Amino acid sequence: RRAAGDIRCLSGSRDGFTTALRRFGTYGPMVRRVLKDSGLHSDIQYLPFVESSYSPKAYSRVGAAGLWQIMPATGRDLGLVLNATVDERLDPEAASWAAARYLKNARKTLTVAARAKNSKVSSRELSPFVITSYNYGVNGMRRAIKKMGPDYIQVINQYRSRKFQVAVKNFYAGFLAARHVARNQKQFFGDIKPGRPLQYQTLILDRQVSIARVQSVFGLSEAELKVLNPALTRFVWHGWRLIPDGYKLRLPRRQDSWRNQVARLRMMPFETRQGGSVEYTVRTGDTACGIAAAFRVVCRALFAVNC
């Protein structure tokens, strides 16, 4: 009864969670593999339900992107490529490895902080702190532990900080709720047909290449390539930039491994981006100098032809 006043209900999310469960069928096996190889608990596979509804295309109003909702600066710190042609935050596998690196560091950092206050604290007791740090930040949780000790309920009820507000306090509870529903999806939603895990093989490009050439050589549609290569930006898909050399191009898995097509691609002349002008529709969050950098022109020159 005392806790009843603290219970919060979220309505209107049934269809969204059903869609997330289908996506979970597509990306969940890969996420579980990454977590296992990283030495992290398998329960973390339910975190993207809270972050993005398991959508690799998700964007937040503050600039976080992808399955794991990674901010640009954080992504670069975690080793992801973010430039005009590639944004690995949108690649579910690359982003999952980055998230795993973040969570491993969080676990290590918060364990040190917690055991400085209580040497007998267990990894299980630290799990809520690690999960919450994904929303609040490692340093924020470290400060909370330093001030209140490694008692999560005490931190939730008594810790005071300008940014430690309702959304942060509810984050772990939301994670537990998502885990419960995902584990018991038949009870809540009946039979849901999960998405099929992606099957692909990787070709490391030894040169820059246009998306048009890839489509032509391999006989693949833009839609087929987009599903497997979500990290490529709109500048590539519109033909304004080439796919960079060294990029790990994903292709549908085939028994012959596309041998003839790969050989043909490597025999073709090198491509260079065509000159001239292009039209670009400005989107929310764009800046003039950011667009200029994407097209490799001087910001001042962009102003000159548009003013």
Language-model features: locations:
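Extracytoplasmic and endomembrane cell-envelope/extracellular-matrix remodeling and assembly machinery
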Residues: 1-33, 37-38, 77, 82-85, ...
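Short, surface-exposed glycine/acidic/tryptophan-bearing loops
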Residues: 58-79, 244-246
